[in-house]
Amino acid sequence: MIRGRLLCVFVAAGCLMSCGASQETTSSGTSSVVLVGLEKTPCHGRCPVYSLRVHGDGKATLDVGRFCDEAFGRSLSQGRHTAQVDVGVWGLVADEAHAMGFDTLAQRYDDPRVVDLPSATLTIDGHSVMNRYGGPNLNELYTRIERLVGRMNWQATPEDSR
């Protein structure tokens, strides 16, 4: 009876320890956690619409919507684009965000009574902050990310492989 209880305790402890250690990995075994991500949603005007994800393994995806030319400083066709990036450069962006106290921010800044405002959801090392109304001014960080996006070598993804 005692052995059975001990076995249950060890199995439960093992399960609990493995829960905190789960992390997405690619087939090569490297982390695919989102190091830096930024998603901007539409408004009724000319707000840029896109979704960027830079993973810890250097793979990046960019889903380009409308009105992105000015934000990126170049023209990219609408649709999905991929790139292999220098993780060190994007790590500096993450470091800058951490230095600003990004990981202490609330997950959501919004007021549903306010209409026609785009939102920006910034993800740094897996922590996401949706900022639509009443949140901190993260515009300098958004601009830095958009400038980096504009300098990257993006490859358009064929529609059938999306």
Residue ranges and their predicted role:
Residues 63-104:
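A short-motif feature that recognizes glycine-rich, charge-decorated loops
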Residues 54-58, 84-92, 124-129:
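A short, structured loop/turn motif at beta-sheet edges
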Residues 50-54, 80-83, 120:
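Hydrophobic/aromatic beta-strand elements that line small-molecule binding cavities or substrate pockets
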